C-alpha cells in the first residue's frame, strides 16, 4: 500500500514537471558549449577559427524512470564576407534542437538560422549583434500519460479516461530571437565577453487547446544574459569563470561556473579540462573534458540539491558536448587567420 502511494506521488510529481516543460524552453547546463542557443550574436564569434561545428546531448531523470527526458542539438556557424579595412565580418549559422519527454508523450523539434555582424571597436574590443529565425513543432500523445482521475487509491486504472480534450496534438509556429555581445581583450592574457538576448520576440502562439488568439496561449519572451572570461595564468593554465541568467515569465535560473584548462602537450594541441558549475538552489555540476587539436569533448553531471533529490537520489542529469572549430582556408594552403581575436596558450 505504501509502495503504491509512493508510486502515485511520483507519477503526479512527473506529471506536474511535464506540464512545467510545456511552458519552458530547452536548455543545457553547458551553456557555453551551445553558443547559438545562448545568443544569436555568437554566430561567427569564433576565437581561433572561422568555422565551428558542435553537438549537445542531455539525459535527465534516468535514475527514476525507464523513459528519461532527452535533449539533443546540432549546430554550426562560420565567418563570411570579412572586411579587413573596416575590421568587421558577418557570421552565419544554423541550429537544430530535439527534445523527447518521457515515453515520447511530449516532443519538440526546432530549427533556426542565424546571422550576426561583428565589428571591432579599436584594438581591444568587439561589438556583435545577431538574429535567429526559426520554426518550431511541438507534439503530444496523451496515451502514454496517467492522470489524477485514474488513481483509485491503490493503483492507476488505465481503463478510465482521464486525458483532457485537445483541439490538436501539435503546434507549429515561427520563432524570432535577437542578441547583443561585447568582448574586451586588452592583452593576450585577459578575455572578457558578455551579452544579452531575447527569445520569442514575436511571442508565438503555442497551445494544444485553443485555436483563438489570446495572451494565455502565447509564449512569454525569454531574457538571457551571460558572461564569459578567460585568464591565462601561464603557458600551461587558463582559468575561465562564467555566469548565466535567464528569465521567462515567472521562471528564472541563475548559474555560475569556473573551468580550468591545462595545456598537457605543451604546444596546445592536447588540453585537459576540469570545472564546476552551480545552478542556484537546484544543482551542482562537475565537468571534465579533453581537447585534441581542434576538437573538444566535455562531460558534465547534474547533482540535484533541491527537494527532488528525495526521488532521484541526487542523480539529476548527465550531459556531453562535442565541439570542433578550425579554419577553412588553411586547407587551401593560405593559412588565413580568423577575424575573431585569438586566445590560446
Range-by-range predicted roles:
Residues 1:
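DNA replication initiation on ssDNA origins
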Residues 4-17:
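Sec-dependent N-terminal signal peptides
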Residues 18-23:
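Sec/Tat signal peptide C-region and signal peptidase I cleavage site
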Residues 24-345:
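Subset of outer-membrane beta-barrel
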Amino acid at each position: 500500500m505504501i509502495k503504491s502511494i509512493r508510486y502515485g506521488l511520483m507519477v503526479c510529481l512527473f506529471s506536474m514537471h511535464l506540464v512545467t516543460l510545456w511552458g519552458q524552453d530547452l536548455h543545457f547546463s553547458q551553456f557555453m558549449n551551445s553558443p547559438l542557443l545562448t545568443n544569436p550574436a555568437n554566430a561567427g564569434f569564433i576565437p581561433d577559427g572561422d568555422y565551428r561545428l558542435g553537438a549537445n546531448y542531455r539525459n535527465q531523470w534516468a535514475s527514476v524512470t525507464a523513459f528519461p527526458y532527452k535533449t539533443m542539438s546540432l549546430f554550426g556557424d562560420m565567418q563570411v564576407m570579412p572586411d579587413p579595412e573596416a575590421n568587421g565580418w558577418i557570421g552565419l549559422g544554423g541550429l537544430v534542437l530535439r527534445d523527447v519527454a518521457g515515453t515520447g508523450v511530449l516532443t519538440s523539434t526546432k530549427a533556426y538560422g542565424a546571422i550576426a555582424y561583428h565589428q571591432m571597436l579599436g584594438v581591444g574590443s568587439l561589438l556583435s549583434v545577431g538574429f535567429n529565425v526559426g520554426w518550431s513543432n511541438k507534439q503530444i500523445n496523451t496515451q502514454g500519460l496517467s492522470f489524477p482521475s485514474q488513481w483509485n487509491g491503490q493503483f492507476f486504472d488505465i481503463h478510465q479516461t482521464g486525458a483532457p480534450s485537445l483541439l490538436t496534438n501539435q503546434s507549429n509556429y515561427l520563432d524570432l530571437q535577437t542578441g547583443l555581445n561585447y568582448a574586451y581583450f586588452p592583452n593576450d592574457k585577459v578575455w572578457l565577453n558578455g551579452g544579452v538576448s531575447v527569445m520569442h520576440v514575436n511571442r508565438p502562439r503555442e497551445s494544444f487547446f485553443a485555436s483563438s488568439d489570446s495572451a494565455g496561449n502565447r509564449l512569454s519572451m525569454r531574457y538571457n544574459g551571460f558572461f564569459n572570461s578567460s585568464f591565462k595564468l601561464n603557458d600551461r593554465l587558463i582559468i575561465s569563470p562564467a555566469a548565466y541568467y535567464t528569465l521567462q515569465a515567472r521562471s528564472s535560473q541563475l548559474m555560475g561556473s569556473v573551468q580550468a584548462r591545462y595545456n598537457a602537450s605543451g604546444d596546445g594541441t592536447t588540453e585537459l579540462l576540469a570545472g564546476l558549475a552551480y545552478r542556484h538552489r537546484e544543482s551542482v555540476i562537475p565537468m571534465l573534458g579533453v581537447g585534441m587539436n581542434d576538437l573538444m569533448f566535455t562531460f558534465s553531471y547534474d547533482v540535484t540539491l533541491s527537494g527532488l533529490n528525495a526521488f532521484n537520489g541526487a542523480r539529476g542529469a548527465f550531459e556531453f558536448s562535442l565541439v570542433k572549430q578550425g579554419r577553412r582556408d588553411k586547407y587551401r594552403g593560405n593559412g588565413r587567420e580568423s577575424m575573431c581575436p585569438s586566445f590560446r596558450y
